[in-house]
């Protein structure tokens, strides 16, 4: 195998993963958010010039609705083009202010007025104008939308592709179990058309699932008569009638097969088939060989056959028999009498030529096209009287106009493919040559001119009858070739189109007035319906979800979701087993592992790592080409339909050095089956072993050793991991951690290469390489502002930390700063913990987890959660609410954290119940209690007309205030605190801009210096003509005076001029940007109606790990912390090192997730190698020895492994730096389905000088005694999940009651009580605890008088109770009375 050396970037050199993969990667992991980003980019086509836009997205929607003509046709509104403006607020400002991030859409339309008087269409005048059509939400670069200040994701939908589908009822409709076949034409929008057989083999049709009609009615409405229908669907046998006796059949031998004749079949004198014998294929061959053209048959052979045409007496014109009649003896006699010499009959038999259409015609009541149209009208609009025009229009609008019916390009492609046509393109309406030829409007003439003699509806019925006849197969609805993905862009386009159609109706009404009243396009178009439709879709559609933002992985997974639910999709209740099941076509397209547990199982899926959608929306997966057994590196993407024709080998098929398949029989997949094929018959091969799984499943190491159900839990639980205080890379990973972190957008990556110029906790400044600097005003400085301590959707903390130092040389794409759950640019969801598998005093019973106190002490699982609390001051009927520190009846101590405006200080530590924002509400006059009267008498009026409605810290929460935002309505004066916040914000922005400008300026001057030093000058400040410009001279000059230099060299002179222009341009630009920012900060805020002021307070809550918190590994091994034990009591190793976590060994065998054991072994080896490197560094070993040891770790089995690590690229200093980063453990990658083998794990343990069994002797921390046997010990990456006991634990003494039942509310959110439910009542009944039970049902619950009295009694020290009537009983009595049953209680 050739050595595959990769060159390492600045970031990658810091820490290298040892990769155990045997397969070299053909494809890099693609951009993981492409499905979202690309789809929306196509929808907007923002960076495409208007005249070059493709027929997609907004452009397509606008083109499909415009031009709009008035009813009279004298005025029309035409579409010219559109452009998107600049968003008013950027993403950060939208999040802060609770706005939606979007840009205004301006559409250019042209109003054309035609001259009424002229006979031809002469244009009277034209007016072109730009019309505002509302805000279009913009996607952030991470594939999300910001709607009302929160990040949302539009999930892609997997729905049934438009086209035609053939199916049967699986024998469920009829008691006999007969299969009833059906066909359904599903358009992209418009009416569904179904065809179905009934148990008597007649064909029916339904429109939009209404009542069924015989299919001949539909064909008659299209303009076919009985003879034409029969000719389309049947082959005709021709009989010549002899004038006196007998009949001659024009013989087609094939058609006789399977019949039994009651006369001898002879060729001349030679009998071929005797009477009563069945005719076989051999007989047919003999007949063909004999060349028999006509066959004399008796009359009764013709009787009972079905006529294919009307029979008319030639002389009198009398109708002797109708098409589709069964010929009787009388009719045959009449034919002879009238001198009819030939008749045609339908060739039918019971086996494979059923008389279905013939049966249908017998039950069809209609005779003419008009009758058929009326019948369809009655079915669609029952109870309305039909007129000829109405019936014709209704039928035409159902399937034949683009306004009402659209198959779409996908639908047409699928339709043509299924009915066996070669061409892919076609009309997006149903086309029928005969129907359109009879109409004479422009559109119909165009269609007829462009198309061949085809009929879509006839062809579907033909395929359906063929399937019924036993030729052809039905479709599998769950095949991914019949389901397609609808992404954001397409859904937004549909919604936009719906809005436009609503606008179109209104415009049509107004267009008639446009001419007389001289209206402009702006007055004609009302943008509200479009804006409303879009807002509704992004804000409250079923597929617009609140983004799951627990950690970077959950963001990426959420955007790669594919849901079968949603508008036009399935519903949970109706979805059966088949839809939810794994289908062979899921391979490489949709993850076979990751799906939710519960009611949505199988309906919500995740895209596989390499999957993408093609132009039609079908999922494709990449394969390597194989030619004559040689595997090439050419990659082809195949959809599920295309894949059907090929034999595909697995990714791990054995190949030799020349890439030839070596096995005699290769395990392959073909048409959904697994089989063995010789190498010559293989067409394709998988690109990667992780092709079948999604991102989350591909992050589970040793996935191949886990049971599928546990792997599913493992993949799902990784998404719930909370980012810890200090992230730790997993010691055992799979090698795609870096790709996930990169694409999730939580890290800061360098846009261009360069040198780090300046850095602090919140900002990184890069001076860009000369080569990467663009022209114009680009000054070559990139400034990255980091996100500090902001709140995610799940209240976890988002914070970015710089990874670089001043002077570091970086390249494009390098990681400059880590985000939440990332460690040097790699995904790091949990912590590497030292784990022992052993029982410990019952503390790990039933998956419980025993923790060491050291874990808590070192803050390994301490997480920061940020809570947002909002206080709103409204205008009430009694006057405005007021935010102030002057609150009645509140102690001085309770207000000591508030400033004079009544808002809490930043940095204050608050506990449950503390006031954070003081607010008073005016209250109406009420009956005063004697105490209040006394107070009034003493203190005067003021004390009682306001009540305290301050924002307090909710129960069970304490933390530190980290940010306060005050929003004030426009036109209301800002308070002191708001002004302070505003000033500090303006200061911050100014400093940012000043720094940026200073750095830009310095960069421009530095570049200019390099261009003019050493050149000859023609003069300048203190410089003679002919002198050279030197560094010293420039240092002595004021920067602004450099521009007075006059250079001899033209290039140098140009450079000075260019630099001056650049600096002036930047100065202007910065001033404008600062003015804009300042304006936004100082302007009033757009608040909800009736809101005067809003204060948002952000609390940072620190949560340590504690009993009751849920934790999990990556293999579905989840548990709850049962106890935290002192370090000295934990089991310890011979070295004296205590373990961190003790897990129950019984959790492994029955769950069959052995991956965790292998992870523990390999993790131990990784840690051991790190310790060995640490010892070498401490002993100051020679660099060459360290290099040799690292080479041994990374490349010892490079004969079988794919990638080698080239350590010669590292300088000694870089190597030492790498060594320092490996002290914590050498990270390993064992890719999914291609991971480390047992031998390799043992080899690593050996290198680390650890026992190869992976087990060691542990000692009891309490007694110091050795345990009876050795224990499996090692490092596992363990996660803390977002199911924290602090969020779930809840207690209440007094609190809110429900008004009707007078019982406490339920649930933590309502601060509710504990329900003493029916099972608890049964328990007390069973014990006979009558008094306790009475107390529970009355005074402790809803007996109002009793509980008030009880309170007084306790205060007075009398411990007795009087139980009265529970309020819920009164409610019951009232409900019974509402049923008009009187019920009274008697003493």
From Swiss-Prot:
Q: Which UniProt keywords apply?
A: DNA-directed RNA polymerase, Nucleotidyltransferase, Transcription, Transferase
Enzyme class, top EC level, equals transferase
- Example GO biological process term? DNA-templated transcription
> Cross-referenced InterPro entries, in alphabetical order?
DNA-dir_RNA_pol_bsu_ext_1_sf (IPR042107), DNA-dir_RNA_pol_bsu_external_1 (IPR019462), DNA-dir_RNA_pol_su2 (IPR015712), DNA-dir_RNAP_su2_dom (IPR007120), DNA-dir_RNAP_su2_hyb_sf (IPR037033), RNA_pol_bsu_bac (IPR010243), RNA_pol_bsu_CS (IPR007121), RNA_pol_bsu_protrusion (IPR007644)
Q: What is its EC number?
A: 2.7.7.6
Q: Name one GO cellular component term.
A: DNA-directed RNA polymerase complex
What molecular function terms (GO) are annotated for this protein? Answer: DNA binding; DNA-directed RNA polymerase activity; ribonucleoside binding
Q: Which reaction does it catalyse?
A: RNA(n) + a ribonucleoside 5'-triphosphate = RNA(n+1) + diphosphate
Quaternary organization: The RNAP catalytic core consists of 2 alpha, 1 beta, 1 beta' and 1 omega subunit. When a sigma factor is associated with the core the holoenzyme is formed, which can initiate transcription.
Q: Main role?
A: DNA-dependent RNA polymerase catalyzes the transcription of DNA into RNA using the four ribonucleoside triphosphates as substrates.
Instruction: Name the family.
Output: Belongs to the RNA polymerase beta chain family.
Name of this chain's protein: DNA-directed RNA polymerase subunit beta
What species was this sequence derived from?
Xanthomonas campestris pv. campestris (strain 8004)
Q: What is the lineage of its organism?
A: Bacteria, Pseudomonadati, Pseudomonadota, Gammaproteobacteria, Lysobacterales
Which gene name does the record give? Answer: rpoB
């Amino acid at each position: 195998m050739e050595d595959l050396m990769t060159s390492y970037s600045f970031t990658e050199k810091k820490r290298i993963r040892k990769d155990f993969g045997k397969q070299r990667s053909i494809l890099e992991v693609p951009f993981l958010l492409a499905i979202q980003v690309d789809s929306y980019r196509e929808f907007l086509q923002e960076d495409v010039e208007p005249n070059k836009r493709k027929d997609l997205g907004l452009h397509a929607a606008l083109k499909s609705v415009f031009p709009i003509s008035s009813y009279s046709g004298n005025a029309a509104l035409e579409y010219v083009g559109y452009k998107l403006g600049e968003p008013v607020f950027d993403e950060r400002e939208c999040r802060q202010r609770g706005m939606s991030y979007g840009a205004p859409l301006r559409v250019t339309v042209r109003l054309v007025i035609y001259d009424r008087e002229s006979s031809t269409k002469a244009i009277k005048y034209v007016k072109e104008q730009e019309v505002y059509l509302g805000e279009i939400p913009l996607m952030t670069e991470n594939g999300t939308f910001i709607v009302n200040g929160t990040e949302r994701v539009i999930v892609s939908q997997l729905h049934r592709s438009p086209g035609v589908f053939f199916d049967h009822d699986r024998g469920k409709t009829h008691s006999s179990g007969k299969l009833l076949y059906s066909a359904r034409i599903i358009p992209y929008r418009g009416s569904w058309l179904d065809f179905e057989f009934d148990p008597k083999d007649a064909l029916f049709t339904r429109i939009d699932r209404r009542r069924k009609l015989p299919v001949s009615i539909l064909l008659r409405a299209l303009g076919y008569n009985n003879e034409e229908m029969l000719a389309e669907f049947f082959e005709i046998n021709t009989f010549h009638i002899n004038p006196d006796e007998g009949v001659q059949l024009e013989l087609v031998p094939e058609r006789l097969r399977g019949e039994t004749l009651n006369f001898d079949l002879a060729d001349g004198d030679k009998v071929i088939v005797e009477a009563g014998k069945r005719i076989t294929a051999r007989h047919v061959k003999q007949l063909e060989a004999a060349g028999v053209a006509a066959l004399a048959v008796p009359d009764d052979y013709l009787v009972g056959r079905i006529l294919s045409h009307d029979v008319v007496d030639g002389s009198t014109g009398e109708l002797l028999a109708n098409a589709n009649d069964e010929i009787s003896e009388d009719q045959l006699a009449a034919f002879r009498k009238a001198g009819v010499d030939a008749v045609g009959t339908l060739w039918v038999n019971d086996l494979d030529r059923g008389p279905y259409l013939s049966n249908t015609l017998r039950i069809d009541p209609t005779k003419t096209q008009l009758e058929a149209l009326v019948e369809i009208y009655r079915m669609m609009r029952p109870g309305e009287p039909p007129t000829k025009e109405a019936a014709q229009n209704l039928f035409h609008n159902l399937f034949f106009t683009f306004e009402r019916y659209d198959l779409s390009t996908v639908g047409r492609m699928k339709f043509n493919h299924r009915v066996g046509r070669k061409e892919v393109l076609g009309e997006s309406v149903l086309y029928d040559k005969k129907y359109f030829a009879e109409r004479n409007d422009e559109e119909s003439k165009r269609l007829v001119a462009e198309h061949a003699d085809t009929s879509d509806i006839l062809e579907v019925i033909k395929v359906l009858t063929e399937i019924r006849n036993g030729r052809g197969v039905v479709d599998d609805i769950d095949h991914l070739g019949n389901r397609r993905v609808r992404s954001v862009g397409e859904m937004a386009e549909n919604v936009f189109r719906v809005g436009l159609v609503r606008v179109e109706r209104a415009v049509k009404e107004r267009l008639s007035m446009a001419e007389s009243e001289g209206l402009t396009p702006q007055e004609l178009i009302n943008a509200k319906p479009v804006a409303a439709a879009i807002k509704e879709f992004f804000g409250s559609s079923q597929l617009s979800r609140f983004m799951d933002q627990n950690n970077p992985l959950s963001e990426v997974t959420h955007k790669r979701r594919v849901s079968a639910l949603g508008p036009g999709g399935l519903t949970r209740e109706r979805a059966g087993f088949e839809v939810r099941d794994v289908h062979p076509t899921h391979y490489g397209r949709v993850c076979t592992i990751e799906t939710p547990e519960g009611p949505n199982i199988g309906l919500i899926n995740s895209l596989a790592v390499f999957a993408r959608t093609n132009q039609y929306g079908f999922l494709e997966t990449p394969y390597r080409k194989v030619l004559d057994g040689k595997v090439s590196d050419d990659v082809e993407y195949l959809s599920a339909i295309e894949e059907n024709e090929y034999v595909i080998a697995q990714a791990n098929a054995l190949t030799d050095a020349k890439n030839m398949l070596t096995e005699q029989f290769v395990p392959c997949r073909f048409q959904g089956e697994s089989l063995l094929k010789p190498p010559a018959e293989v067409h394709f091969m998988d690109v990667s072993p992780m092709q079948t799984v999604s991102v989350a499943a591909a992050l589970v190491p040793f996935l191949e050793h886990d049971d599928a159900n546990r792997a599913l839990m493992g993949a799902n639980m990784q998404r719930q991991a909370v980012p810890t205080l200090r992230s730790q890379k997993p010691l055992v990973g799979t090698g795609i951690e870096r790709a996930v972190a990169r694409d999730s957008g939580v890290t800061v990556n360098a846009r261009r290469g360069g040198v780090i110029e300046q850095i602090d906790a919140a900002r990184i400044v890069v001076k860009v390489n000369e080569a990467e600097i663009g022209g114009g005003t680009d000054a070559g400085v990139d400034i990255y502002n980091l996100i500090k301590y902001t709140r995610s959707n799940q209240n976890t903390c988002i914070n970015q930390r710089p990874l670089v130092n001043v002077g570091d040389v970086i390249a494009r794409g390098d990681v400059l700063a880590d985000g939440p759950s990332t460690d040097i640019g790699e995904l790091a969801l949990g912590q590497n913990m030292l784990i022992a598998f052993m029982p410990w005093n019952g503390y790990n019973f039933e998956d419980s987890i025993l923790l060491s106190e050291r874990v808590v002490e070192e803050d390994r699982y301490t997480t920061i959660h940020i809570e947002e609390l909002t206080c709103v001051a409204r205008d009430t009927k009694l006057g405005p609410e007021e935010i102030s520190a002057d609150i009645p009846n509140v102690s001085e101590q309770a207000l000591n954290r508030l400033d004079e405006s009544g808002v809490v200080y930043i940095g204050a530590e608050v506990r449950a119940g503390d006031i954070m924002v003081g607010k008073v509400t005016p209250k109406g006059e009420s009956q005063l209690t004697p105490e209040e009267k006394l107070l009034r008498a003493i203190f005067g009026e003021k004390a009682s007309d306001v009540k305290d409605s301050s924002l307090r810290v909710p129960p069970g929460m304490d933390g530190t205030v980290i940010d306060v935002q005050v929003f004030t309505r426009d036109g209301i004066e800002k308070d002191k605190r708001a002004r302070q916040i505003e000033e500090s914000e303006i200061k911050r922005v100014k400093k940012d801009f000043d720094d940026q400008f200073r750095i830009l300026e310095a960069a421009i001057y530095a570049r200019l210096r390099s261009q003019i030093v050493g050149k000859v000058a023609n003069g300048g400040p203190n410089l003679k003509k002919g002198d050279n410009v030197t560094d010293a001279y420039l240092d002595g000059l004021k920067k602004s005076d450099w521009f007075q230099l006059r250079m001899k060299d033209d290039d140098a002179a140009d450079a000075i001029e260019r630099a001056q222009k650049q600096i002036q341009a930047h100065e202007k630009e910065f001033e404008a940007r600062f003015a804009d920012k300042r304006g936004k900060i100082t302007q009033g805020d757009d608040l909800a109606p009736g809101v005067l002021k809003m204060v948002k307070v952000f609390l940072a809550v620190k949560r340590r790990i504690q009993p009751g918190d849920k934790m999990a590994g990556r293999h579905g091994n989840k548990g709850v912390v049962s106890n935290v034990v002192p370090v000295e009591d934990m089991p310890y190793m011979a070295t004296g090192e205590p373990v961190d976590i003790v897990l129950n060994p019984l959790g492994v065998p029955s769950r069959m997730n052995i991956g965790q054991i292998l992870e523990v072994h390999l993790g131990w080896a990784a840690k051991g190698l790190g310790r060995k490197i640490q010892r070498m560094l401490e002993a100051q070993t020679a660099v060459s020895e360290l290099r040799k040891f690292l080479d041994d770790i990374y490349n010892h089995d490079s004969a079988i492994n794919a990638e080698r690590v080239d350590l010669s690229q590292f300088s000694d200093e870089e190597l030492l730096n790498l060594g320092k980063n490996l002290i914590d453990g050498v990270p390993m990658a064992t890719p999914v389905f291609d991971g480390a083998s047992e031998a390799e794990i043992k080899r690593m343990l050996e290198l680390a000088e650890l026992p190869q069994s992976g087990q060691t002797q542990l000692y009891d921390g309490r007694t110091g005694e050795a345990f009876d046997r050795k224990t499996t010990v090692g490092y596992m990456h363990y996660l803390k999940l977002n199911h924290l006991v602090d969020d779930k634990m809840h207690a209440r003494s007094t609190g809110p009651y429900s008004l009707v039942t007078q019982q406490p509310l339920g649930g933590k959110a309502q601060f509710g009580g504990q329900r003493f439910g029916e099972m608890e009542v049964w328990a007390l009944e069973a014990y006979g605890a009558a008094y306790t039970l009475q107390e529970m049902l009355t005074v402790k619950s809803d007996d109002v008088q009793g509980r008030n009295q009880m309170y007084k009694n306790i205060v007075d020290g009398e411990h007795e109770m009087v139980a009265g009537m529970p309020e819920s009983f009164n409610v019951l009595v009232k409900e019974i009375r509402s049923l008009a049953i009187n019920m009274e209680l008697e003493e």
